[in-house]
Amino acid sequence: MSEHVYNLVKKHHSVRKFKNKPLSEDVVKKLVEAGQSASTSSFLQAYSIIGIDDEKIKENLREVSGQPYVVENGYLFVFVIDYYRHHLVDQHAETDMENAYGSTEGLLVGAIDAALVAENIAVTAEDMGYGIVFLGSLRNDVERVREILDLPDYVFPVFGMAVGEPADDENGAAKPRLPFDHVFHHNKYHADKETQYAQMADYDQTISEYYNQRTNGNRKETWSQQIEMFLGNKARLDMLEQLQKSGLIQR
């Protein structure tokens, strides 16, 4: 039995430095088609993909993101929850469909659809020899992103993805993930605090050693310290407001 896909995904790491070589239209089309083949809840296909190669648009999005590789890449994708087409169907429907696509469940369906599509594209791109990095930073200013991309109601930007050939001096590596026994619960969830704390303590040590070796001692923080810093930072607290402005999560 071939383990090609297993070995490919196990090597995944974010690439943040790319060669100045744009993806061809053929490659972009193949990536999007691979994304479209992902599973979709109830065949709703509640997503769209916006492909961006316009340098001005990239620069505008970089201002939102604050990350140079939003501009410096082979191609930029933005993944959106998309119920605009469903809204158009609703205009001629005998039932009130907005109760569904404006619901919290509708939001979850769209976000999951977009994520599944994006992961298909990521794996396909890596199989082609490209590197990728996801860009949640586009949510730093959702209103501005909606303006830049001319998004109508019922469409919400979830994240972006930069794709391209890794630069010759790109030296990223796969980070150690949480232990198998910590994320895989057999038959039911195991919430024993002592076990959870012990597993996280071991993982903290693993991550601290990883950073220490990767940076020649310049970084030694643990995973728990990273989580405390990230979740303690009161950022993007306007998501509910922005979702509702888009016509989503009305109930």
Curated annotation (Swiss-Prot):
Pfam families: Nitroreductase. Reduces FMN, organic nitro compounds and disulfide DTNB. Involved in maintenance of the cellular redox state and the disulfide stress response. Its cofactor is FMN. The keyword RNA-binding does not apply. The keyword Oxidoreductase applies. GO terms for molecular function: oxidoreductase activity. It is an enzyme of class 1 (oxidoreductase). InterPro entries: Flavin_OxRdtase_Frp, Nitroreductase, Nitroreductase-like. This is NADPH-dependent oxidoreductase. Keywords: Flavoprotein, FMN, NADP, Oxidoreductase. Belongs to the flavin oxidoreductase frp family. CDD domains: NfsA-like.
